[in-house]
């Protein structure tokens, strides 16, 4: 799920081994993974990912609306410039594709245009926009 969830092991064991294998085999393919937006905070990790052949990363951005990020408890996305974070990852040569959600209680009336503007400004080529749903037994489901 979140590729960077265990950074210590990733940076000391998995990525060095993967880099050696990819170099020895002349980079026969590329990898795609999923990570949280705070990947952009770790320059060394992004460098290692590129050297290991990780070409694309899926990031759950969800929304450019800060109050909605708080609503869905997306702490790693709060209090940061999401556009700048995406650009940082892209500048390392990693293509970002992302997931977005509409339907939060705090979505402003212009949320669709804000999503479009964010996607276009960020250069995200593949954006998956979905409607918020309430899985059974979730807090949202019980509230509704």
PLM feature spans:
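Conserved SAM/AdoMet-binding glycine-rich loop
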Residues: 1-104
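Flexible glycine/acidic-rich beta-alpha junction loops that bind and position SAM and/or redox cofactors
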Residues: 6-9, 67-72, 102-110, 125-144
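Short secondary-structure boundary/capping segments
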Residues: 14-18, 114, 142-144
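Catalytic cores of alpha/beta
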Residues: 44-49, 105-121
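Hydrophobic alpha-helical segments
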Residues: 74-76, 117, 144
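Generic recognition of well-ordered alpha-helical segments
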Residues: 85-88, 118, 140
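C-terminal accessory region of radical SAM enzymes
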Residues: 92-95, 122, 141-144
């Amino acid at each position: 799920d979140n590729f960077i969830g265990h950074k210590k092991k990733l940076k000391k064991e998995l990525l060095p081994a993967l880099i050696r294998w990819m170099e020895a085999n002349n980079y026969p393919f590329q990898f795609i993974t999923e990570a949280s937006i705070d990947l952009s905070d770790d320059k060394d990790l992004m460098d290692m990912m590129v050297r290991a052949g990780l070409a694309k990363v899926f990031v759950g951005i969800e929304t450019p609306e800060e109050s909605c990020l708080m609503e869905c408890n997306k702490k790693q996305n709060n209090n940061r410039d999401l556009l700048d974070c995406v650009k940082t990852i892209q500048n390392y040569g990693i293509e970002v594709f992302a997931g977005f959600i509409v339907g939060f209680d705090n979505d402003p009336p212009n949320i669709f245009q804000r999503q479009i503007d964010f996607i276009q400004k960020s250069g995200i080529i593949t954006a998956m926009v979905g409607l918020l749903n309430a899985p059974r037994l979730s807090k949202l489901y019980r509230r509704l």
